[in-house]
């Protein structure tokens, strides 16, 4: 630590505290402000758009200072946290009246992006996720907690950085902690990340924190169930939270292991390509997610993050949806749900000591809706709905307690009192009555003094500095009674006090202090009573979230004309009249649905051809989105859907330069393709859109053909869109490959897209017609037509002969070139060898 002896005692104190929190902003309490100094002040001034001033000097230079009012600090802190930064709150803990030198101060709380519970700091529809990554021997152990949910989840051991990146980005955490300084420096996740000291990832410390933080039975179960490296990862979260909270995180009540084999896996690129859960209005989440509560919205996002392949869970969800659809029963349930607040986060705030009086009113009002909700659920007497209903606890005693204790519109905090309802506590009422009756005393006292002095202009008043006083004009100085004691002199008047008024003042001020202290004690006792219902409220919140999501699915099923999917074990995917929800939602004309059939017995690979804008990409995306919806338990946009077991969805759609990594469009495309080829299996759904277009025609064709052949050999269900019409010949070589194309009709030099998938290969690409639709000028179009004519006339024979030779087309005449082609066995040569032969023939 630097020499601080040349600073003032106050700055010395600040620097000592700051040295323990070097990487985060220190909010240092001074009176009614939180002040920041040095670099913290500069950063805060820029982030918060507040004035940067100066205080004193350091080494001859002014010390930068910026501050925010204490009463408005929450809004400023929220801005900082939402930018991914952390804050240490340093409060005055000593008594200014007894302190020698600076008042004692301590950091009472640390606020980080993932460890906030206040409503102002949180997105109500987004889980606040803290991820811990323990790297050891080239393996990654990962655990995460949804802070206000009170649970820790352990993920399977990850063996590659790419696998780790996909897992982390799928969780979309607000904050990451790790033992790896290298990982923190690289930060491939582009999320707030910090490398912690080694002791956070000590196995000994981990077991200690597990024992200290969790219920004894849960702790013993965890210690027996998981291996040391897994325990270290769990313990790192508990130790980090303990340090942040300055207390044991008692709100963590559950730890569970996520079973990957029960999940439909979708990597981050595929999620982006399919527009599953981004913030755009055209994302699948924005169309499907119409939950009535924040609880339901967050649970739906978890469904989107982890689609389940557990058929029992999916059957339960589908059965509940069917029950709620009957007579549109979901409408009544959604009406009740709309009155329920975020009780999960409210009870977490109670446990964490950050709850506000208005939260308790919201909790009471929400709990009052539970009897109505339970009655509505009981009307659907199915085992699945009954199971949910049994986990919703009707907490009438707590409702009564909160109703009696808290006024209807309480102030923002308990700091100045005024929260507890009259009649709840006799002692508090008596203390308040002294203040309430003070007005009558002052009126009578003032009238008595007027009579006694004969001065009609005499006034009795009060201010916070001097207290109660009697005010008289200076012209009446000769009439002042001897018992009047001068308290304050003004320009035109004098203020006095009497022993009687002083006694009254002491009584009033004493009663105020006692009333406030009493009210705070009652409030703390009330919170202790509320926390006794923690587990019941958490379980109730989880059940409300579940019924909210399923009622939402029921409403969406009716509104969007969705149907219940079936599941089979026949390796067959049969879909009829499939629609793309986002496109259907955003166009005025009727959407053209399409059928899809993929089966190991007929075809696993579809080569899809047709013009741009014809519907190829939409067709592929809608199949992937339908599979995804089926595996989150929703109904699907099709008239019929029979789905086999799909464990992963891969997509290669579109590309752009990755400038930050120095990778070209083609390199990005090939990297993503390599990942899919290396990981796809017979249980994968693969979407490939225009592979090979980022390089020369021959290279692109060779690569596209090789990739398509590989997918055919793997047996992955593959939708392969291409402009290389030569690939349609693969259907003659592989029994599990078929061709489909999207039709277009020409009329008077115009093109009309049918958007209908038809068996067979396309005959034409319609590129010039599409260019016309895009607004290319007529002179350019005419030039393009002439160029096309010349190319077809001059190069058709040579190029078509070379390319078609790869697909074993019959020769039309016998010459040396054709004899050479006849001698080639294309079933045994590689694409590279084929290209070499083509170049050799071209030289001839």
Swiss-Prot record:
InterPro entries: DNA_mismatch_repair_MutS (IPR005748), DNA_mismatch_repair_MutS-lik_N (IPR007695), DNA_mismatch_repair_MutS/MSH (IPR017261), DNA_mismatch_repair_MutS_C (IPR000432), DNA_mismatch_repair_MutS_clamp (IPR007861), DNA_mismatch_repair_MutS_core (IPR007696), DNA_mismatch_repair_MutS_N (IPR016151), DNA_mismatch_repair_MutS_sf (IPR036187). One of its GO terms (molecular function) is ATP-dependent DNA damage sensor activity. ATP binds at residues 610-617. SUPFAM superfamilies: DNA repair protein MutS, domain I (SSF55271), DNA repair protein MutS, domain II (SSF53150), DNA repair protein MutS, domain III (SSF48334), P-loop containing nucleoside triphosphate hydrolases (SSF52540). GO terms for cellular component: cytosol. Keywords: ATP-binding, DNA damage, DNA repair, DNA-binding, Nucleotide-binding. PROSITE patterns: DNA_MISMATCH_REPAIR_2. Pfam families: MutS_I, MutS_II, MutS_III, MutS_IV, MutS_V. Coiled coil: none annotated. One of its GO terms (biological process) is mismatch repair. This protein is involved in the repair of mismatches in DNA. It is possible that it carries out the mismatch recognition step. This protein has a weak ATPase activity. Belongs to the DNA mismatch repair MutS family. This is DNA mismatch repair protein MutS. It comes from Francisella tularensis subsp. novicida (strain U112).
């Amino acid at each position: 630590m630097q020499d601080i002896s040349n600073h003032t005692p106050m700055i010395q104190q600040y620097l000592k505290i700051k040295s323990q929190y070097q990487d985060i902003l220190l909010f240092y309490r001074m009176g009614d402000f939180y002040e920041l100094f040095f670099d913290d002040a500069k950063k805060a001034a820029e982030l918060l758009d507040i004035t940067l001033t100066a205080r004193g000097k350091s080494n001859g230079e002014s010390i930068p200072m910026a501050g925010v009012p204490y009463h408005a600090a929450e809004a400023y802190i929220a801005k900082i946290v939402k930018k991914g930064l952390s804050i240490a709150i340093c409060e005055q803990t000593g008594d200014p009246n007894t302190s020698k030198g600076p008042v004692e101060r301590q950091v009472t709380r640390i606020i980080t992006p993932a460890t906030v519970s206040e409503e102002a700091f949180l997105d109500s529809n987004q889980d606040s996720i803290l991820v811990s990554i323990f790297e050891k021997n080239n393996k990654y152990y990962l655990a995460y907690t949804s802070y206000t949910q009170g649970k820790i989840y352990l993920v399977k051991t990850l063996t590659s950085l790419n696998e780790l990146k996909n897992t982390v980005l799928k969780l979309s955490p607000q904050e990451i902690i790790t033992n790896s300084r290298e990982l923190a420096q690289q930060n491939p996740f582009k999320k707030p990340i910090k490398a912690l000291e080694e002791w956070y990832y000590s196995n000994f410390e981990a077991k200690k924190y597990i024992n200290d933080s969790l219920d004894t039975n849960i702790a013993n179960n965890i210690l027996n169930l998981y291996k040391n490296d897994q325990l270290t990862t769990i313990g790192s979260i508990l130790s980090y939270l303990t340090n942040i909270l300055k207390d044991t995180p008692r709100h963590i009540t559950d730890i569970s292991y996520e079973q990957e084999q029960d999940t439909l896996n979708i990597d981050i690129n595929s999620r982006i390509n399919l527009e599953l859960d981004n913030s755009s209005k055209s994302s699948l989440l924005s169309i499907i997610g119409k939950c009535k509560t924040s609880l339901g919205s967050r649970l739906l996002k978890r469904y989107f993050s982890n689609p389940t392949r557990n058929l029992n869970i999916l059957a339960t969800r589908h059965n509940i949806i069917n029950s709620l659809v009957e007579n549109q029963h979901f409408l009544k349930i959604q009406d009740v749900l709309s009155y329920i607040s975020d009780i999960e986060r409210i009870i977490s705030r109670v446990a964490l000591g950050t709850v506000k009086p208005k939260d308790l009113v919201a909790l009471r009002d929400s709990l009052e809706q539970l009897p109505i909700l339970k009655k509505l659920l009981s009307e659907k007497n199915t085992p699945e709905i009954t199971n949910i209903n049994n986990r919703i606890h009707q907490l009438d005693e707590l409702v009564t307690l909160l109703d009696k204790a808290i006024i209807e519109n309480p102030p923002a905090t308990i700091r100045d009192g005024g929260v507890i309802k009259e009649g709840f506590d006799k002692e508090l009422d008596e203390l308040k009555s002294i203040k309430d009756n003070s007005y009558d005393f002052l009126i009578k006292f003032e009238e008595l003094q007027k009579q006694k002095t004969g001065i009609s202009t005499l006034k009795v008043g009060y201010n916070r500095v001097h207290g109660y006083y009697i005010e008289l004009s200076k012209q009446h100085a000769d009439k002042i009674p001897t018992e009047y004691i001068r308290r304050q002199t003004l320009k035109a008047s004098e203020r006095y006090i009497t022993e009687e008024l002083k006694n009254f003042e002491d009584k009033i001020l004493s009663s105020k202090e006692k009333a406030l202290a009493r009210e705070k004690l009652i409030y703390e006792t009330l919170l202790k009573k509320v926390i006794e219902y923690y587990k019941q409220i958490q379980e109730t919140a989880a059940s409300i979230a579940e019924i909210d999501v399923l009622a939402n699915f029921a409403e969406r099923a009716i509104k969007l004309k969705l149907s219940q999917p079936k599941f089979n074990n026949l390796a067959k995917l049969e879909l009829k009249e499939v629609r793309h929800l986002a496109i259907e939602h955003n166009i005025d004309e009727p959407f053209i649905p399409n059928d899809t059939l993929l089966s190991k017995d007929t075809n696993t690979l579809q080569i899809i051809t047709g013009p741009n804008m014809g519907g190829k990409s939409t067709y592929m995306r809608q199949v992937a989105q339908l599979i995804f919806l089926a595996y989150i338990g929703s109904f699907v946009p099709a008239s019929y859907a029979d789905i086999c077991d799909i464990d992963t969805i891969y997509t290669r759609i579109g590309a752009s330069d990755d400038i930050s990594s120095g990778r070209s469009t083609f390199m990005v495309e090939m990297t993503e393709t390599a990942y899919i080829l290396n990981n796809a299996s017979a249980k994968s759904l693969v979407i490939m859109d225009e592979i090979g277009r980022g390089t020369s025609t021959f290279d692109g064709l060779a690569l596209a053909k090789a990739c398509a052949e590989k997918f055919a050999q793997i047996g992955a269900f593959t939708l392969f869109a291409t402009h290389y019409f030569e690939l349609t010949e693969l259907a003659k070589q592989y029994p599990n490959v078929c061709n489909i194309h999207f039709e277009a009709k020409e009329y008077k030099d115009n093109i009309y897209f049918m958007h209908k998938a038809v068996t067979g290969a396309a005959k034409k690409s319609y590129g010039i017609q599409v260019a016309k639709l895009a607004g290319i000028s007529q002179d350019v179009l005419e030039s393009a037509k002439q160029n096309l004519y010349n190319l077809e006339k001059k190069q058709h024979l040579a190029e078509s002969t070379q390319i078609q030779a790869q697909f074993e087309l019959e020769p039309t005449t016998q010459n040396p070139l054709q004899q050479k082609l006849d001698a080639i066995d294309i079933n045994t040569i590689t694409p590279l060898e084929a290209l070499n032969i083509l170049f050799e023939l071209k030289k001839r």
